[in-house]
Amino acid sequence: MILDLLNLISGVIDMPWWGYVVTTLILTHITIAGITIYLHRHSAHRALELHPIPSHFFRFWLWLTTGMVTKQWTAVHRKHHAKCETNDDPHSPVIFGIKKVLLEGSELYRKEAKNPETLKRYGYGTPDDWLERNIYSKHSAKGVALMLIIDIILFGPIGITIWAVQMMWAPIFAAGLINGAGHYWGYRNFQAEDASRNILPWGILIGGEELHNNHHAYATSARLSNKWYEFDIGWLYIRLLEMMGLAT
């Protein structure tokens, strides 16, 4: 029994230090893929349709790793496009300043996600099944708590660090970097009626969301790359899903 307890404390999976780093990067990348493919391109913009298998997987995974509710995220993002760079934009660095969006982007998101008028006007067409009503929306915070338990069981004490990185990943890169730097630094392929910028021509770390100006120019396109030298890894994943009959 003592040996079993020690094994549990040390974690089910034992790896060298670099193995934990790689595992953390993979786990956080799955989260980013879920945000860009499921929440952003599928739910908010209807740029593609997802088969129930990846759709339910991403919903479950994002519940575990972010606690974000599909209706809330979709509504806030749609309002951002509808009111971009105005006083009604939930997270514009033009209005709030780049420092505030970079450092407090997740707080700006949570504030708008609690706005019933925003949810009513922009949250249409999002999941409203039993799972959404009774688990994902009703108990959004319990998902991240469950993820902590899973990480500790799998990886031992270092699982707490892995979990902490998972929890910070979306607020830093999605809520902060994309919503902030994506409207402040970078280059523009299109003179859109907003301050959107392409942060980098290679969209890998943030799933292709780095190509933010391209997205604002063609918001309903599932592909965010435009020039021959630009790369959108999210589009690559979508094409793979299409080949497997899991996306259209």
Walk through the language-model features, giving the residues of each.
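Non-catalytic, topology-defining segments of multipass membrane proteins
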Residues: 1-177, 181, 221-248
